[in-house]
């Protein structure tokens, strides 16, 4: 493990600790349970899960550090020149599914890849981002989420937030449904356009911004009363989350194709989900407004 990899690993372990501590404090009931694991083909990680809390119905914050002799297809499909290289991958990935339908689901991920081949220069890159999936949209929350994202990107250039915001909108899109998974945020991958230290600093800025983006939303919405009907709608919309993660998500595909730990990879799935055949929201309802207004390509900072 190189000094660069060691520095990234130290940051990611600390990030996992800080995020878990902040979420435990905010929940005020449940605590994370840690499950350390070892990957037979090389590496391992520590999965931390939380459930049935006062606020969080199910959540997970996973650290992994895996390596192998060859990149799996999900990682080399768009970079065929990397096929056959040994790899090392480190990351923190998290998903939080709250009880209350008025509190959005959140997802964040930061990661580092390095692909090596004897006699050739190592190829490295960073990736990550965070995105928000509301069930009952609130404009204040959407603007706050994107404002924090913009502020995290600002030191790295005025074009960074709009570029990675647009990438997030494209990435978290369910092609078979013709709709986005949520209201977006940031997404970046294959980041090595700056020097290593700048790229690493950017990854840290995104990782550190997650708590600032999400906790104020929890605090504003966690005590909002909700009905059984609203809970059913939340479970229906969670189905879209499952569909995206199992069909499109590159992290899920990479984990499964590289022989990762299935329980840790699938920790992102919500605990209660429903599908209704050809279900449609009543026109003009709160449920219809989610797709008609919130799940649209929108510049939230121009509101």
Curated annotation (Swiss-Prot):
* Species classification: Bacteria, Pseudomonadati, Pseudomonadota, Gammaproteobacteria, Pseudomonadales
Annotated keywords: Cytoplasm, Heme biosynthesis, Metal-binding, Oxidoreductase, Porphyrin biosynthesis
GO CC annotation terms, alphabetical: cytoplasm
Which molecular function GO terms apply here?
coproporphyrinogen oxidase activity; metal ion binding; protein homodimerization activity
The positions annotated for binding substrate are 93, 109-111, 259-261
- Species of origin: Pseudomonas entomophila (strain L48)
Alphabetized Gene3D superfamilies for the sequence: Coproporphyrinogen III oxidase, aerobic (3.40.1500.10)
Where along the chain is a divalent metal cation bound? 97, 107, 146, 176
Q: Does the keyword Cytoplasm apply?
A: yes
Q: In which pathway does it act?
A: Porphyrin-containing compound metabolism; protoporphyrin-IX biosynthesis; protoporphyrinogen-IX from coproporphyrinogen-III (O2 route): step 1/1
Region feature Important for dimerization, mapped onto this chain: 241-276
Tell me what reaction this enzyme catalyses.
coproporphyrinogen III + O2 + 2 H(+) = protoporphyrinogen IX + 2 CO2 + 2 H2O
Q: Which InterPro entries match?
A: Coprogen_oxidase_aer, Coprogen_oxidase_aer_sf, Coprogen_oxidase_CS
PROSITE patterns documented for this protein: COPROGEN_OXIDASE
Q: How does it assemble?
A: Homodimer.
Q: What is this protein called?
A: Oxygen-dependent coproporphyrinogen-III oxidase
List the active site: 107
């Amino acid at each position: 493990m190189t000094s660069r990899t060691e520095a990234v690993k130290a940051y990611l372990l600390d990030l996992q600790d800080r995020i878990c501590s902040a979420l435990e404090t905010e929940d005020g009931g449940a605590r994370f349970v840690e499950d350390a694991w070892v990957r037979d083909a090389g590496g391992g990680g520590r999965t931390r899960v939380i459930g049935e809390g006062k606020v969080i119905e199910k959540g997970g914050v996973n650290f992994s550090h895996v390596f192998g002799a060859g990149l799996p297809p999900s990682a080399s499909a768009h970079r065929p020149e990397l096929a056959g290289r040994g790899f090392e991958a480190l990351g923190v990935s998290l998903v939080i599914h709250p009880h209350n339908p008025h509190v959005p689901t959140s997802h964040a991920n930061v990661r580092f890849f390095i692909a090596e081949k004897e006699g050739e220069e190592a190829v490295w890159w960073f990736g990550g981002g965070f995105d928000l999936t509301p069930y009952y949209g609130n404009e204040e929350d959407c603007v706050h989420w994107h404002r924090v994202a913009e502020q995290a990107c600002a030191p790295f250039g005025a074009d960074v937030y709009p570029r990675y915001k647009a990438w997030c909108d494209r990435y978290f899109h369910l092609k078979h449904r013709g709709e986005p998974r949520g209201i977006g945020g940031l997404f970046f991958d294959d980041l090595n356009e700056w020097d290593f230290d700048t790229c690493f600093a950017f990854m840290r800025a995104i990782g550190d911004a997650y708590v600032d983006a999400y906790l104020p939303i929890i605090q504003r919405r966690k005590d909002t009363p909700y009905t059984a009907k609203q809970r059913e709608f939340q479970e229906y919309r969670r189905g879209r989350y499952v569909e995206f993660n199992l069909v499109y998500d590159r992290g899920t595909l990479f984990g499964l194709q590289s022989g990762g730990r299935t329980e840790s990879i699938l920790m992102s799935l919500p605990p209660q989900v429903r599908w209704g055949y050809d279900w449609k929201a009543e026109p003009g309802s709160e449920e219809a407004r989610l797709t008609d207004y919130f799940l649209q390509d929108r510049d939230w900072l121009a509101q």
